Amino acid sequence: MSVLLIEAFYGGSHKQLMDLLQEELKEECVLCTLPAKKWHWKARTAALYFMQTVPASANYRILFASSVLNLAELAALRPDLGKLKKVLYFHENQLAYPVQKCKERDFQCGYNQVLSCLVADTVVFNSAFNMESFLTSIGKFMKLIPDHRPKDLEKIIRPKCQVLYFPVRFPDVSRFMPEHKLAHLENVIGVKRNGDFYQREGLPGQQKSRALGGLMKNSNACRESGLCETQPGLCTTQHEGLHSPLTAAGRLNKSEASESTNPCQEEDKQHVTFNLCNIWSGMDYLQRPLHVVWPHRWEHDKDPETFFKVLLKLKEQELPFHVSVLGETFTDVPGWKRCIVAVTRCVPRPWCTRRSSQLNICILHLNSFLKGFRISARDQIL
């Protein structure tokens, strides 16, 4: 175990990166983590915790940690770890991170990241914007110090920095793709059919991705809980066993015979039949409505209010579109008023049905729309 992996906020993309590294390095690494709760407390106190819990070993050669950890503190508290080659990875930086409220920025968190960069041997950022926004903000950030300010820190840190894009392991979704796209993959990208799924030519055979299994598991749970009902133009959360447009149409015809006739439901079924057939056959591919996906967690730093302003602009111009809202939400839900406005103006039927021929909102792991209605009646006046 020559690589020591330390993650002070083991959740989300931080967890994904560490899990991938651990899977690739196998027995060559040891992983030490703290749960993804109370971010600011982890940033301030994680070094002291890891000082006591990281096992000592003469085999360590590399220390890899995210910027949540105060690397300078850990190196001072554990001299044996300070001697290692230290790699610091920035998922985000606190010098350019959006502030939720108009208040003074938490100086200590950004200051800790600057200290960590000075101690690290290599500093890695997940994007060029992340790197440049951090480096170019150091000078202005240090001016917050009343007097005796350090100088030229950017010049000291920049030579250590490089961009390494976040590694993404894509699930095998070929079973959901229309034939014309599968042909494109086969002819242009160099993937080859192998049984029920596609793989790159020349690579050894592999089982279907676990991520795909998780996707289908979440999809089934979502259908069973009633959160995702039939949505026009959205096929990724339904019809797990579909292999052709014929089976899709057959299932829909079967359901039509068994369900009570309702004008709204009949309209939805017609849209679903049309769109599913188009998806699987490739017909009218460019004519289908724009499908907008919100893949982020629902927090202030992702600016959900601007997202809803764009949706309302699309609606004002009478452009057809679908929306899929993904990701997790937390106790405080930002943009609640914009959510209510969007639902009120864009969804012509009662929200409880979660159906619309104009706007389809697929809620998988997000209930912020419903949480928005918990605001007091006075504040809900639009």
Swiss-Prot record:
Its main location: cytoplasm. One of its GO terms (molecular function) is tRNA-queuosine(34) beta-mannosyltransferase activity. The keyword Glycosyltransferase applies. Pfam families: QTMAN_N. Coiled coil: none annotated. Its EC number is 2.4.1.110. It catalyses: queuosine(34) in tRNA(Asp) + GDP-alpha-D-mannose = O-4''-alpha-D-mannosylqueuosine(34) in tRNA(Asp) + GDP + H(+). It is found in: Cytoplasm; Nucleus. Signal peptide: none annotated. It is an enzyme of class 2 (transferase). GO terms for biological process: regulation of translation; tRNA modification. It comes from the Eukaryota. The gene is GTDC1. GO terms for cellular component: cytoplasm; nucleus. Keywords: Cytoplasm, Glycosyltransferase, Nucleus, Transferase. Transmembrane segments: none annotated. This is tRNA-queuosine alpha-mannosyltransferase. Glycosyltransferase that specifically catalyzes mannosylation of cytoplasmic tRNA(Asp) modified with queuosine at position 34 (queuosine(34)). Mannosylates the cyclopentene moiety of queuosine(34) in tRNA(Asp) to form mannosyl-queuosine(34). Mannosylation of queuosine(34) in tRNA(Asp) is required to slow-down elongation at cognate codons, GAC and GAU, thereby regulating protein translation. Belongs to the glycosyltransferase group 1 family. Glycosyltransferase 4 subfamily.
